[in-house]
Amino acid sequence: ETPALVVAHGSIKRVSNFPSTFVNPRNIDIWLPDHYSKGKKYAVIYMHDGQMLFDSAINWNHQEWGVDETMGRLINEQKIKECIVVGIWNTPKRHSEYFPQKPFESLSQAGKDTVTKQLQSTGKTDKAFQPVSDNYLKFIVTELKPFIDSTFSTYTDRRNTFIAGSSMGGLISMYAICEYPEVFGGAACMSTHWPGTFTTNNNPVPSAFV
């Protein structure tokens, strides 16, 4: 059992092993700002790699993004509007869940084989690589978002719904806003892992995004 998270601002509500018909169950950590009230409505930011966001004590590398500190400070300084952050934990399928599926499927078979070999060489897959990011986004849009909107006091429109991540999380955030522009009004794609694999030599992936 993962210990309760320690945050500097606001509070965390955890849903353990959130079920899905599209992806494997995973923990969801919902950060609520200081003075959260059912009498107000809040924008929502969906963030990938949820276990890395709030508390370094639970992470493999003992580092965290400091999302609670940063969001709390920016809200208190009135630099951003009050919002909720939904931290979506990753799983061992992280690379295939975060890898944009339609660009991959647009590659020739030779291109797909090249990607598979490049990912096999770094231990990211032990078989033919197949992204499952379309199902990951269906999980967020059709299962997780309705739960968040029905459980917490949120604005549900695209102007108040955002998605964010770093590295492969940046890549899937880019894919999310392209696939669901009617759902997400903005995406923060930080240090985006544009190569998709771990080499730029003979890599067909970046051109597939164009």
For the regions a language model picked out, list residue spans one by one.
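Non-catalytic cap/lid and distal C-terminal segments of serine-dependent acyl enzymes
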Residues: 2-210
